[in-house]
Amino acid sequence: MTDETEEDDTTQQRSSRNDGVSKNKGKGFKGDKAKRALIGAGGRILFYPTLLYNLVRFKLQSQFRWWDQIDEYLLMGAVPFRKDVPRLKKLGVGGVITLNEPYETLVPSSLYSAYEMEHLVIPTRDYLFAPSIVDITLAVNFIHKNALLGKTTYVHCKAGRGRSTTVVLCYLIEHKSMTVAAAFEHVRSIRPRVLLHPSQRKVVEEFSRLQSPLSESTFIATSGDIVS
């Protein structure tokens, strides 16, 4: 693992047009816009300090893993650095889903391409926000397509706690026939620090209802920590 950074390269990224806010929210409210702007500014300020904190924990605590294998063809974890790309390739990764905003992204799409990895970019604001149902569906289909080809997909956000968990849960719900509760417990048993914000839980439950309207899709949050 390395802590070197690299300028963002957005020219070759397959990117979602929306900003990751649920379409069910009210639109155009000045308070919501101010809140988003404030959280966005705070996220930029906190990005490198929190990234450094995670790196220190990774180096000092053996149980603090940068990524974890959730399913046969599915890895999820924290933001990768450039030197991680060859390691991911050796692990059989053929696709990467980035749920970070551009300022949080440390590996350009061109580098993934050089290692024959597809790169799906779904920019989603940190802390309080979730990908839309449309983007989650795109991500789930991407993971499933790679799995059918025997390729592993790496799903990541900044710390591998909230945004990436949202997508991974939805994949398990659709393609492994899990309930929301079962999917969450499965992921948490492998990566104990995962945590969903209420907006992320809501979109996972909505996705589950769309897959099976009669399915049970409620689970209890276990902590109020900041997520990413």
From Swiss-Prot:
SMART domains: DSPc. Residues 66-213 form the Tyrosine-protein phosphatase domain. It catalyses: O-phospho-L-seryl-[protein] + H2O = L-seryl-[protein] + phosphate; O-phospho-L-threonyl-[protein] + H2O = L-threonyl-[protein] + phosphate; O-phospho-L-tyrosyl-[protein] + H2O = L-tyrosyl-[protein] + phosphate; a 1,2-diacyl-sn-glycero-3-phospho-(1'-sn-glycero-3'-phosphate) + H2O = a 1,2-diacyl-sn-glycero-3-phospho-(1'-sn-glycerol) + phosphate. Its EC number is 3.1.3.27, 3.1.3.16, 3.1.3.48. Belongs to the protein-tyrosine phosphatase family. Non-receptor class dual specificity subfamily. PANTHER family: PHOSPHATIDYLINOSITOL PHOSPHATASE, TYR_PHOSPHATASE_2 DOMAIN-CONTAINING PROTEIN. This is Phosphatidylglycerophosphate phosphatase PTPMT2. The lineage of its organism: Eukaryota, Viridiplantae, Streptophyta, Embryophyta, Tracheophyta.
